[in-house]
Amino acid sequence: MNTIIKRFVQQLKISLSTDFWKTLISTLGAVSAVVTLISFVFQVHNPCTLMIVIYFIIVIGGSLIISWLLSRRRDSLKLKLSNTLTVNVNAGDIFDYASDTNYVVIPVNEYFDTVVNTKIVSPSSLHGQFINKYYGYNHIELHEQIENYLTENNVEYIEVTERPNVGGYKKKYPLGTCVPVQVGQVTYVLVALTHFDDEDHAYVELSEFGRCISSVCRFIEKNAGNRPAYMPLMGMGLSRLNQTGQFILKYTLDTIIGVKDLAIPGGLSIIVNPPTAKTLDLNSIKY
């Protein structure tokens, strides 16, 4: 019971926004008109004090409840952008969607590193979590899969002479490069999202970030068929975009919409980690 009350209070706090007050003003007028019409139909003349009090309670109370229901914070979003593209936004753990024959996007760095430590691939990043979850200490196997795919598809790269941290690979691939990795029936799509600077710190420019999103969308369109695809809200972690979750989500959606004639019949879902999801205002996102 306490949890329900706390959730209601939290939702109410979030609802007390400009949208809430706009909705309340219009709802007050509508509810007041309905109550007035009812009193006219039933010929309520010279109402007593009790009737007046009841009238105000119904108008004010009803308006508050209706306004809250209409403007309360949404925790998911479904956007049908075309006959061949529906984008969903949901809160959760991206790995929970790794089932059946789904496509799941994992952002990685431009070297497609597979060594997880505090210097090369952070264990807290999705890149690191993916490696630890499915490959553990057998990261060489993953590296060979990635290398074979990139070689077979003649993906161009730049070979650097050295990197600050020993153990990092030295072939640098263009941002937006996608590599499919099969784990059981699930296809993980590793997408090069970030550069490494001279000290092996990850970063990405906003314009490059947009191109990466476009690239992974095209890859899914080409390969996923009717299978659903899931991607995290990228750019929130170690990529250092230094933008709010709201900005990045809107930018991501705008970029997806801007991909000409994009067709993903199985649907594309953007999965937002719960702490970030709490900061989002999905009510304001409209297309």
Feature locations, PLM:
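Macrodomain-like recognition of ADP-ribose-binding/processing modules
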Residues: N2-Y287
